[in-house]
């Protein structure tokens, strides 16, 4: 399921990219695992409003059936809590510490802040990460970086996310990172985004900065085709 939109352009890694690539892996894995079965049987238990989810997301009804069966296989209760989410996520980054980034990512999936992610939450985010427009992906990324959900990103929030990404990558980075590398990257990007120099980045500033600066867009990896 999962740095959403990657890490900065100077960071190269032997690991897979976080949010979008893991989301893509999950979708492919579950589709391959279940598709043959779906050819012969109907999904007997569906969340309410499957047709509504089809209208609200960029998935077909068949794709939603595949995703739902896979979600139920991984989470029989129909919801996933943060501890389980962290355990699943950590499997993709065995050489680093993914717990902090998984915490932030879980909060971005848990849009209602209930402490659990339902299938509806999961598939809505997955739709954005895999098939959303650039604008939708940027808004989702802004929400990830807005840790305290006050509608703004301050430098420390950005630093917390970036540091969590580097921690998650662990030793599998090239070139080897210096301890102050995350801070240097945050300083550069925050200066570009905070256009009125008031110490915070608004959604409008974030959207404008990302769309007018090719370096920022590349660093967020919004143009990577995953479908």
UniProtKB/Swiss-Prot annotation:
Pfam families: EF-hand_7, EF-hand_8. PROSITE patterns: EF_HAND_1 (PS00018), EF_HAND_2 (PS50222). GO terms for cellular component: cytoplasm; cytoplasmic side of plasma membrane; dendrite; Kv4.3-KChIP1 channel complex; plasma membrane; synapse; voltage-gated potassium channel complex. Ca(2+) 1 binds at residues 146, 148, 150, 152, 157. GO terms for molecular function: calcium ion binding; potassium channel activity; potassium channel regulator activity; transmembrane transporter binding. Isoform 1 and isoform 2 are expressed in brain and kidney. Isoform 1 is also expressed in liver, pancreas, skeletal muscle, small intestine and testis. Isoform 2 is also expressed in lung, pancreas, leukocytes, prostate and thymus. GO terms for biological process: chemical synaptic transmission; membrane repolarization; muscle contraction; potassium ion export across plasma membrane; regulation of heart contraction; regulation of potassium ion transmembrane transport; regulation of signal transduction. It is a peripheral membrane protein. Its main location: membrane. InterPro entries: EF-hand-dom_pair, EF_Hand_1_Ca_BS, EF_hand_dom, Recoverin. Keywords: Calcium, Cell membrane, Cell projection, Cytoplasm, Ion channel, Ion transport, Membrane, Metal-binding, Potassium, Potassium channel, Potassium transport, Repeat, Transport, Voltage-gated channel. Ca(2+) 2 binds at residues 194, 196, 198, 205. Residues 214-227 are annotated as: Interaction with KCND2. It is found in: Cell membrane; Cytoplasm; Cell projection, Dendrite. Residues 38-94, 97-132, 133-168, 181-216 form the EF-hand domain. Regulatory subunit of Kv4/D (Shal)-type voltage-gated rapidly inactivating A-type potassium channels. Regulates channel density, inactivation kinetics and rate of recovery from inactivation in a calcium-dependent and isoform-specific manner. In vitro, modulates KCND1/Kv4.1 and KCND2/Kv4.2 currents. Increases the presence of KCND2 at the cell surface. Component of heteromultimeric potassium channels. Identified in potassium channel complexes containing KCND1, KCND2, KCND3, KCNIP1, KCNIP2, KCNIP3, KCNIP4, DPP6 and DPP10. Part of a heterooctamer composed of the tetrameric channel and four KCNIP1 chains. Probably part of a complex consisting of KCNIP1, KCNIP2 isoform 3 and KCND2. Self-associates to form homodimers and homotetramers. Interacts with KCNIP2 isoform 3 in a calcium-dependent manner. Interacts with Naja atra venom CTX3. Belongs to the recoverin family. This is A-type potassium channel modulatory protein KCNIP1. It comes from Homo sapiens (Human).
């Amino acid at each position: 399921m999962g740095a959403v939109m990657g890490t900065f352009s100077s960071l190269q890694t032997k690991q897979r990219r976080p949010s979008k690539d893991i989301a893509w892996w999950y979708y492919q894995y579950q589709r391959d695992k279940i598709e043959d079965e779906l050819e012969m049987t109907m999904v007997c238990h569906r969340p309410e409003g499957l047709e509504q989810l089809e209208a609200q997301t960029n998935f077909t009804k068949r794709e939603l059936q595949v995703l739902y069966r896979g979600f139920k296989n991984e989470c029989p209760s129909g919801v996933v809590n943060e501890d389980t989410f962290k355990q699943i996520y950590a499997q993709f980054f065995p050489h680093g510490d993914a717990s902090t980034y998984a915490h932030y990512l879980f909060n971005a999936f848990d849009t209602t802040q209930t402490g659990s992610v339902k299938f509806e939450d999961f598939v809505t985010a997955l739709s954005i990460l895999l098939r959303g427009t650039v604008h939708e992906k940027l808004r989702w990324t802004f929400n990830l970086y807005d840790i305290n959900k006050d509608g703004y990103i301050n430098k420390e929030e950005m630093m917390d996310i970036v540091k969590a990404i580097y921690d998650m990558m662990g030793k599998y980075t090239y070139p080897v990172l210096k301890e102050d590398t995350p801070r240097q990257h945050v300083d550069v990007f925050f200066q570009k985004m905070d256009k009125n120099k008031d110490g915070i980045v608004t959604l409008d500033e974030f959207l404008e900065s990302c769309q007018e600066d090719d370096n920022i867009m590349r660093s967020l990896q919004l143009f990577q085709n995953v479908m």
